[in-house]
Amino acid sequence: MDITILGSGTAVPSLDRNSSGVLIQEQNTHSLVDFGYGTLKALLHLGISYHDIDRIFFTHNHPDHMCDLVPFLFGARYHLSPRKKDLEIVAGPGFGEYFENLMSAFKNWLVPSEYQIRITEIDEGTKDFGCFSVISKKVRHIQISRGYRFENLDGKSVALSGDTDYCDGMIELGREADLMILECAMPDEEKIAGHLVPSLVGKLAKEAKCKTLCLTHFYPPCNMEIIRKTVSAIYKGDLFLAQDLMRFQL
């Protein structure tokens, strides 16, 4: 399983960090977890186009986690090279209605010309997707928010939080995972509801006992040295601070 950070940033535009997005490649399939702005271009840097994506998982529907879906769908209609492979979009309950409203807002300009879109709503539980299974659990951000754990046929696992505060659901998803990708939105002194700070990241990762931890979703007040020092004082596993296009192999 190959995992690439497409965007390690936030809702605040940055020259250095795209908004949230992760690419998971397994057995010649390409799955996205979130699709924030800038991530579509990051895919092109990897040689991956709108033809290649098989499935998109959304942790929730805030713009910094999904707005590159619009140019993706619009580009896939390009008449000289239209997408032909069906696309599955996976998200929490209520996403189907949200997606219909999004499509309506753009009239017919996002409607596929030569492929079908299937919306799969999953609440909490496990679903088999062939080359991997996905466990979904509620996390603490907004009502639709879900965290995911991907497990391939070799037993390798990656857990992803999207946006979340400290919660049991994310601890369970990250339990002894080979890799856990957690948001670390703000420094401790700037804590806001629905987001993690370094001390809580360290506590969550320690309780989950994940093997490797990658932090992402850094708002401008974040100081990387302080984040690393604070988290490392609590969590003793391997720690990475995400950069766009950082890759992991499991």
Region annotations inferred by a language model:
Residues F72-E88, R140-R146, E151-N152, A193-C214, ...:
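P-loop/Walker A phosphate-binding loop and immediately adjacent motor/lid segment at beta-alpha junctions
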